[in-house]
Amino acid sequence: MIQATGIGAVLGGITAKVTQHSGIVGAIIGGVVGAITGQKLSNMQCDYEGQEEILLSKINTAIENNTYLINQTNSLNQHMSTLYSQINTMQANQQTNLRKKSYLISEINKKKREILNIKTLNNNVLLKVRQYNSLLKNTKYSKQDKERVQNTLQKITISLQKIKRASIYNLKQLDEFKKKVQHA
């Protein structure tokens, strides 16, 4: 038995918060994604076959991807608030020019592409996390250590599912925004 150390196998204390906004964007997440409390796995005992180290490294990558997606969603939500404000201002002004409308539609389309990219990466990470859960069963970790990793993977999955729902909501909102601009 040797320790799986020196592999950067710390699942980190990630505090993943999704910013909430007032108004139409307020319901995007339906609350805070929640703190993903990672645990140190570097002191886990296992029979060394290399498989465990690779798996932990992959889980760390999944956590990094999850954090990136949360940050992207936060940033996107802030932009959505700004966009919504601009559309409201435009609707209040009867003299809206075509250049302004064209700019807003261009921004909306850009945000839609960003969301679709987030959705794609999010789905890929979700798929990988499911695979890691399966791989974990074939490792020689103790039952207790396996449960620790499974708990972390479960927290990542919950967070990713919330991001997925947020992306779907955001896409619907952007379609509504587009209609408002086109009919202004």
Predicted regions and their residues:
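Helix-termini ("caps") and immediately adjacent flexible loops/tails
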Residues: M1-Q3, Q39-A184
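Short, low-complexity, glycine-enriched hydrophobic/amphipathic alpha-helices that associate
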Residues: M1-E49
